[in-house]
From Swiss-Prot:
Gene Ontology CC, one term: cytoplasm
Regions of compositional bias (Basic and acidic residues) in chain numbering: 103-158
Region ranges (Disordered): 1-213
One of the protein's GO biological processes: mRNA cis splicing, via spliceosome
Matching CDD domains: RRM_UHM_SPF45
GO molecular function: RNA binding
Pfam name, any one: G-patch
Tissue-by-tissue expression: Expressed ubiquitously with highest levels in dry seeds and in cells surrounding the base of trichomes and guard cells.
Subcellular location: Nucleus; Nucleus speckle
Identification of the protein by name: DNA-damage-repair/toleration protein 111
Amino acid sequence: MLGGLYGDLPPPTDDEKPSGNSSSVWSSSTKMAPPTLRKPPAFAPPQTILRPLNKPKPIVSAPYKPPPPSNSSQSVLIPANESAPSHQPALVGVTSSVIEEYDPARPNDYEEYKREKKRKATEAEMKREMDKRRQEDEERDKREREEREKERERDNSDPSRLNISGEEAWKRRAAMSGGGSGGKGRSSSPPGNVDGFSIGKSETSGLGVGAGGQMTAAQRMMAKMGWKQGQGLGKSEQGITTPLMAKKTDRRAGVIVNASENKSSSAEKKVVKSVNINGEPTRVLLLRNMVGPGQVDDELEDEVGGECGKYGTVTRVLIFEITEPNFPVHEAVRIFVQFSRPEETTKALVDLDGRYFGGRTVRATFYDEEKFSKNELAPVPGEIPGY
C-alpha cells in the first residue's frame, strides 16, 4: 500500500540531503515517541519522596537500553526500577515501661498523691510491725511449749516429787538454803496446830489460808512471832485486833477506819439520817459545812454539781459565802442545789447529811423554793444561835 502511494516519486539524491546533523532530526522525532521509549535526560530532576531518619540510598533508575534488533514488530519493555533492589526503612519499636499514663481528662493532684504515698507507707510499716509481732509471739509460744515439755519430762522422770506436801517441800527448800547443815540451820516452821490459831476458819482476810489447807507465809511469820487469833499486835497485846479499812467519803477523798467501828458507825448513821428527815420536801437542797471560809474556788460549783448529779437532774447550783467577822465557821458557806423533782432532793439529803467531805461533816436540809427564786440566801434572824 505504501509502495503504491509513493511509488511515483523519484529517489532522493545527495544534493537533497540536509546539511544539518542527522541527530537533530532524530531528536525531534524522539519527542514524538511514546514515553516508554524516550531516553531519560542526563540530569534527572530531584525526586521528592519522604526519607526516613536513617537516610537510605536514593533509588536510581537504570539507563535505557534499546532492544536488540529483531524482525518482529513486537517490542519488549523493561521497567526502569527492575534491576534496582527496593530499599524500605526498617521501623524499630521502642518499648517503655509506663506505670500510669497521663490522662488529660483526669488531672493529677499533688496533695492527693502525697496522701496516697503516705498511706501506702503507713500500711507497709503496719504490716511489717504485725509480721514482727506475730513472729515474736510464735517464738515465745515455741519457747513456752519447750519449757512445758521439759518440765513434764522432769516430773515424769522423778515421780517421788509428787508425793510430798507443801510443808515438806518448804522444809526441804529451807534445808537446802541453810547449806545442808541439820544442826544449826534455818529453823523449820511451827506446826499447824498452834494454840489459839485456827487455820480452817480465820476471820482475818489479810492472812488467808494456803492451797490445800496449808499455812501461808504471812501466817507462819505471825505465828513465829507469837501471834494468836484474837490477840492484839505488839509485845503487850496493845495493838489493834481488827484490820483497817478504807472508807470512801467523796469521789476523790476517803478515810481509814477500823472494821468494827465502821459497821457500828454505819448503823448509827442510818438511824440519824432517818431522824433528820423532817418538813415538807422541796426541790432545793441546802448544804452547810462542806467547805470553810476562803475555800470557795471556781471548781467547787462543778464538783458539787457532778457529785449531786448521781441523785437526779441538777438544774442550778449557787454558792453563798458570808464574810462577816466572828461568824460561825460551819455556817459561813451555804451551797444551794436545785433538782428537777422533790424525790431527787430527798435522795440526796439522805445520802449527804452527815457525810464527811474534806474532814468536815456535811449538814443537808430542805430549803424554801420561793426564797431561792428570789435569791434570799442569807440566814434569817434566829436560824443560827448567836447571829
